[in-house]
């Protein structure tokens, strides 16, 4: 009878601060950790920690599947993806599923399949997580020594690192297989406004691939974010996958050298801090990639980049006024510079006006109109295609400059659509997450180094403020 809600609601609420709940191994008295530091109780329980990790993976994959199906259910084929707040379907479309010429979505069934596969996978992971958290052995060392470990066992840790690297390498080869053998990927640069194509000749020249790493991150250089063709993208995945797999084999077969044993802190919290630093770096790179790059993140799905929307505005009005009889090659603007076209400091012909700052934009709808010295005046007069006009007008009104209340667009564009671009969502979220992961890295690295030096064991729990507070009931 006690379990009936009608009876139970009158009983006092017990909190973990009371010490009266008999939860051996889960309360502060028996573990030394308060409720909010729950993960710390699993530091030396490899079986339970495995359960936590598998369950976490299940939550991640469940989100991916559920959000995928949610986006499929809400998708309207007549509207561009970027106007519908989608962040998962653009990734699937970029991989070449369900897409036709010009980025038109011709089939949503592959997206449905993707969502269902992720949901089924999440159920398997969820079951495994619950099993290992509640039923399986607390520690793996006795029953399954291959999966067991001690945090300070340097050789075992680098073996685990090696296994992870091999899995990452296999993952890096998946887009390679899709691009080369399984239908190809979407190429925004394909003639006529983009199409799905197989990448038959990936760039394997190391000077081309590693040249990106040696570029400046600033200005027109743009480090790896400046990649502008799928041959280099897929070739980079071949190199990265190979390096990860060979590096993984190396770390499995070798023991850490003396300099590495001295240089690193070898504890669970130290490994956590290294992982957080890596994820932080990934977040910052992803932020820049999705904001600036329109090859890996095609504008057909993610909307235009900021510079792209600005240049599209200049192009749209050049087209309009040229039709009305303006001499776009010689017309002066209010500052005495060219109204439609001007010269960059190095002599190329570029769009005039405020968009001059984005003169080095490269976009598939604009490149056909360039000559050896910037924009080609005769091409602008004779060769502009209807699809280029349509696309630039669309991009002009969909700049990725939305604020939280969706009042967005280029400030000088009265026709701007009120929406928040997926580029805004993805770049902002990855920057913020990257920043907080970096703070987490500093926090855990500091604690791990202090613990290794022997002068910091965490907060002194005898004087923790919560211990002197009145229980909540």
Swiss-Prot record:
Q: Which UniProt keywords apply?
A: Acetylation, Chlorophyll, Chloroplast, Chromophore, Manganese, Membrane, Metal-binding, Phosphoprotein, Photosynthesis, Photosystem II, Plastid, Thylakoid, Transmembrane, Transmembrane helix
Q: A single GO CC term, please?
A: chloroplast thylakoid membrane
Q: Which GO terms describe its molecular function?
A: chlorophyll binding; electron transporter, transferring electrons within the cyclic electron transport pathway of photosynthesis activity; metal ion binding
**What InterPro entries does the record point to?**
PS_antenna-like, PS_II_antenna-like_sf, PSII_PsbC, PSII_PsbC_sf
Task: Give the cofactor binding note.
Answer: Binds multiple chlorophylls and provides some of the ligands for the Ca-4Mn-5O cluster of the oxygen-evolving complex. It may also provide a ligand for a Cl- that is required for oxygen evolution. PSII binds additional chlorophylls, carotenoids and specific lipids.
Q: Which residues carry this modification: N-acetylthreonine?
A: 15
The Phosphothreonine modification is found at 15
Q: How does it assemble?
A: PSII is composed of 1 copy each of membrane proteins PsbA, PsbB, PsbC, PsbD, PsbE, PsbF, PsbH, PsbI, PsbJ, PsbK, PsbL, PsbM, PsbT, PsbX, PsbY, PsbZ, Psb30/Ycf12, at least 3 peripheral proteins of the oxygen-evolving complex and a large number of cofactors. It forms dimeric complexes.
Q: Which family does it belong to?
A: Belongs to the PsbB/PsbC family. PsbC subfamily.
The function of this protein is: One of the components of the core complex of photosystem II (PSII). It binds chlorophyll and helps catalyze the primary light-induced photochemical processes of PSII. PSII is a light-driven water:plastoquinone oxidoreductase, using light energy to abstract electrons from H(2)O, generating O(2) and a proton gradient subsequently used for ATP formation.
Q: What is this protein called?
A: Photosystem II CP43 reaction center protein
What organism is listed for this UniProt entry?
A: Pinus thunbergii
């Amino acid at each position: 009878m006690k379990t009936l809600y009608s009876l139970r609601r009158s009983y006092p609420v017990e909190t973990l601060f009371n010490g009266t709940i008999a939860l051996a191994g889960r309360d502060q008295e028996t573990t030394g950790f308060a409720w909010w530091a729950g993960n710390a109780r699993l530091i030396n329980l490899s079986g339970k920690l495995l359960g936590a990790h598998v369950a976490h993976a299940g939550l991640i994959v469940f989100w991916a599947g559920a959000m995928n199906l949610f986006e499929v259910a809400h998708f309207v084929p007549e509207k561009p993806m970027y106007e519908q707040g989608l962040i998962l379907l653009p990734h699937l479309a970029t991989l070449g599923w369900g897409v036709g010429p010009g980025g038109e979505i011709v089939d949503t069934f592959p997206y449905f399949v993707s969502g269902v596969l992720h949901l089924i996978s999440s159920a398997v992971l969820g079951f495994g997580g619950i099993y290992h958290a509640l039923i399986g052995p607390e520690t793996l060392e006795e029953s399954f020594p291959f999966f067991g470990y001690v945090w300070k066992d340097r050789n075992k840790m680098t073996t685990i690192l090696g296994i992870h690297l091999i899995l990452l390498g296999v993952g890096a080869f998946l887009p390679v297989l899709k691009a080369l053998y399984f239908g190809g990927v979407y190429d925004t640069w394909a003639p006529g406004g983009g199409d799905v194509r197989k990448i038959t000749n990936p760039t394997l020249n190391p000077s081309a691939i590693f040249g990106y790493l040696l570029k400046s991150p600033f200005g027109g250089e743009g480090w790896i974010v400046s990649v502008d063709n799928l041959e280099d993208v897929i070739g980079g995945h071949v190199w990265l996958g190979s390096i990860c797999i060979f590096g993984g084999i190396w770390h499995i077969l070798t023991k850490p050298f003396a300099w590495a044993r001295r240089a690193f802190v070898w504890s669970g919290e130290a490994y956590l801090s290294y992982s957080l630093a890596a994820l932080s770096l990934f977040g910052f790179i992803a932020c820049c990639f999705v904001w600036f790059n329109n090859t890996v993140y095609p504008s057909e799905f993610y909307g235009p980049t900021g510079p792209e929307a600005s240049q599209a505005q200049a192009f749209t009005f050049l087209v309009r006024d040229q039709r009305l009889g303006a001499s776009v090659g010689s017309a002066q603007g209010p500052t005495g510079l060219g109204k439609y076209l001007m010269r960059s400091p190095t002599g190329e012909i570029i769009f005039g006006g405020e968009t001059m700052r984005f003169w080095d934009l490269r976009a598939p709808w604009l490149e056909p109109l360039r000559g050896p010295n910037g924009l080609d005046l005769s091409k602008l007069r004779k060769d502009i295609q209807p699809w280029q006009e349509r696309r630039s007008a669309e991009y002009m009104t969909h700049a990725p400059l939305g604020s939280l209340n969706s009042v967005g667009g280029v400030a000088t564009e009265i026709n701007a659509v009120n929406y928040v671009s997926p580029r805004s969502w993805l770049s902002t979220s990855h920057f913020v997450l990257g920043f907080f992961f970096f703070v987490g890295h500093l926090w855990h690295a500091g604690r791990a180094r202090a613990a290794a030096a022997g002068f910091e064991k965490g907060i002194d729990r005898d004087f923790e403020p919560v211990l002197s507070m009145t229980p909540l009931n």
